[in-house]
Design a protein with these regions (language model features):
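Single conserved hydrophobic/aromatic residue that forms the stacking wall/gate
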Residues: 1-7, 11-12
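Auxiliary Fe-S-binding modules of radical SAM enzymes
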Residues: 12-126
Length: 126
């Protein structure tokens, strides 16, 4: 397995434009536990710290990294078009310009003792 994703069950919480609008979303703790289990089961996999966990908890992406995630995906789309693909309500970083988002994300990752690497990030078998 080259990549795994956990977080979508949290995205449905309060997402008024989805069929899941009235469903209860998952918890951050459950998501972090699943990230940790995926890391133990797949030591080389790319596992993202999603914007969904950052939307649910102000330090959610940092917590996901510390739980085993190893990928972050900044929102680099122009601010003017982001409203066209809001997957869930109150999505993190929708108003920040790409450079602002990158600077903020870099500081957040450094605050937990890691740094962002900007190479291609291809899956590698070790």
């Amino acid at each position: 397995i080259s990549a795994c994703l956990v977080g979508s069950e949290m995205c449905i919480r309060d997402s008024k434009d989805t069929v899941f609008a009235k469903e209860t979303g998952g918890s951050l703790d459950l998501t972090l536990n699943l990230v940790a289990m995926l890391r133990l089961m797949n030591p080389n996999a790319m596992i993202p710290a999603t914007t969904a966990v950052g939307t649910i908890d102000p330090r959610g992406r940092e917590k996901a990294i510390l739980s085993g995630a190893n990928v972050v995906m900044p929102n680099l789309s122009p601010v003017s078009v982001r409203k066209n693909y809001m997957l869930y309500d109150n999505k993190l970083c929708t108003g920040d310009e790409a450079a602002e988002c990158r600077k903020c994300l870099d500081a957040r990752i450094r605050s937990i003792g890691y740094e962002i690497v900007t190479d291609r990030g291809d899956y590698r078998e070790f």
